[in-house]
Amino acid sequence: MNDLSCPAIAFPFFLDPVIIRLGPIALHWYGLGYVVGILFAWWYAQKLLKKHSLWNTNHPPMDKEKIGDFVVWSAISVVVGGRLGQVLVWDLAYYFNHPSAIIAVWDGGMSFHGGFIGIIIAMIWFARKNNINIRAMFDIVAAGAPIGIGIVRICNFINQELWGNITTLPWAICFPLDPYYLPRHPSQLYEAFMEGFLLFIILFIIIFAFKALKRPGTVAGTFMIGYAIARSISEVYRAPQEDPEWFSTLFHSTGFTYGMALSLPMLFFGIYLLLQAFKHKSTENGHPKRKN
């Protein structure tokens, strides 16, 4: 705990990253956040698959029972991909010197972009194995993903990681783990709102008001573009992380961050999916409708 006093303009942080301790076992908010996010995405996907009118020709691309089979694979892919991304992309030197810390996922340290790549691989594998249109599979998973992202960002806040730049705004937060104990932007909460709850509302609207699931790839494309934009905005308020040396050399003092760079492929892939979704006027769960 920092002994310095929090300035009057800011709120002192007081949340415990651990929900409850039972002897040597501790339940962390961070781990619970991932569980709740995945369970919500599972529940929401089942609801979408049951509502046949949302899909082209009133026929969902898969049975709702199938999404239950995918839950385990999605959880594994997100955790493994997220952790590997954190280790290899952000903190390789630290984990090289502290290899035992690699498995300590409950302490935080998960790369969103690594988890994204992990679940993309899992979705492609699962879709091909079960003869499901890949773009429709992307849509189903993307529809509920923002809620999980929002919850995990709140857990980042509770874990006192990824805090923001110094600010004099009235909602500034003093984090005890900050060695300078200065008032900072609660950038994790900005991300929770933009990448999570706002993006979910946008996807909800295009699904139910504009029937976006009838054009496979529309929901996933919108999600990827929306996340890339939201992440880039939030990077402005995040405290700088230690970027790879080659990146710092190329983009020193430009304001272009490594997080922004990692979001660019998502932006381009999202645009590609939208172009593919609107390439054909009539589609049947991702395949051009055949003429008789």
Swiss-Prot record:
Q: What is its main location?
A: membrane
- One annotated Gene Ontology cellular component of this protein: plasma membrane
Write the Enzyme Commission number(s) for this entry: 2.5.1.145
Q: How does it sit in the membrane?
A: Multi-pass membrane protein
Q: What does this protein do?
A: Catalyzes the transfer of the diacylglyceryl group from phosphatidylglycerol to the sulfhydryl group of the N-terminal cysteine of a prolipoprotein, the first step in the formation of mature lipoproteins.
Describe the family membership recorded for this protein in Swiss-Prot or TrEMBL: Belongs to the Lgt family.
What is the name listed in the Swiss-Prot or TrEMBL entry for this protein? Phosphatidylglycerol--prolipoprotein diacylglyceryl transferase
What organism is this sequence from? Bartonella quintana (strain Toulouse) (Rochalimaea quintana)
Q: What lineage does the source organism belong to?
A: Bacteria, Pseudomonadati, Pseudomonadota, Alphaproteobacteria, Hyphomicrobiales
